[in-house]
């Protein structure tokens, strides 16, 4: 029936090959499937027939959904989806369908009830999987299902930053989703905020990978979309992977040291920037205060000039009273002018008061900024002391992981700055093979390097080890 429906719906456009356990071509439960891209009209016809044939959405319940996504350095995702199907109908359950919102490849399906056959339908980045059980699930029974597949269209790269986007339909009340990033990958966190959505996650590590986990408890069906932005970091000794435990510890201590330096450096720079902003604001306020003082001086000059004009007018009025017969009329005109000037003077006086209040307010604000500046200076000094103390402690980390012979050779290199392997053999009395082996190990761990001086290769410390020794 299933094969007939698929054939009737898609015979004109493509072919689906079903292989069952009793087929003469295979002797396993695996069904091989050709990738199919479907026209819109045929999709509608197929879905109608598909849901008639597989109308079991209410016939079973999905529980205990677990999705593990392991991201590889080549941007491929190894995805494992496991869940339990419960049959809550009065009849046996022989087949189900499951949707994965990605284009998957190289997939396998296993079930505790056995898999008689399965098919996959691809359409615009979505894979619809139909599974037929070898042993139908009886009423009230259940089966465990595991789908393993590879996804290579869920990660985008721009300017060295990778963005992962995955969506999952969640019908189970309880679900766990785990994203395992590649070795050396770190989640971006500008301004201290991790670029991971949605919230509610927790981050763990197994020593090599950052792992993001969501434990979901839901009361309805949802589509759960995950986005993660990450990048890769490099560090000294990165190529030392399969080394003794002491070298692994050294690698992790170096990573911790680098991150610690970056954090303290970031805090120090942040405090410096904050201090610079306060200084700039103080400078702007001082400039504004100077401008207000200049305006106040101009207003005082205007008041002084107006007072002189008033005095001149009063003199003219006095003369007019003596010389003119219509002195009353002239006095009236002059009085009006005097009133206008007095009004202007009063207005200027009011403005003068306002400017004085602003100056007083700005002076108080300057005092506040000075106090904040002093606090920031104290904080910068405190952070500088912490950073110095941290760097002093860090310098002893690498030394504690060296053998006595390695310490002797490194002391000679530190003392002479540059030294040949032959000189080390002569000074220490060690055998040439032993010295050669120790130097080779120190070079592999990026602690020393060879530098050609003239025609002779001499040994010297690397820049990174100089900071740590």
From Swiss-Prot:
InterPro entries: ArsR-like_HTH (IPR011991), DUF7343 (IPR055767), WH-like_DNA-bd_sf (IPR036388), WH_DNA-bd_sf (IPR036390). Pfam families: DUF7343. One of its GO terms (cellular component) is plasma membrane. It is found in: Cell membrane. The keyword Transmembrane applies. It is a multi-pass membrane protein. The chain crosses the membrane at residues 42-62, 179-199, 249-269. Gene3D superfamilies: 1.10.287.1490, Winged helix-like DNA-binding domain superfamily/Winged helix DNA-binding domain. Keywords: Cell membrane, Membrane, Transmembrane, Transmembrane helix. Its main location: membrane. This is Uncharacterized protein MJ1254.
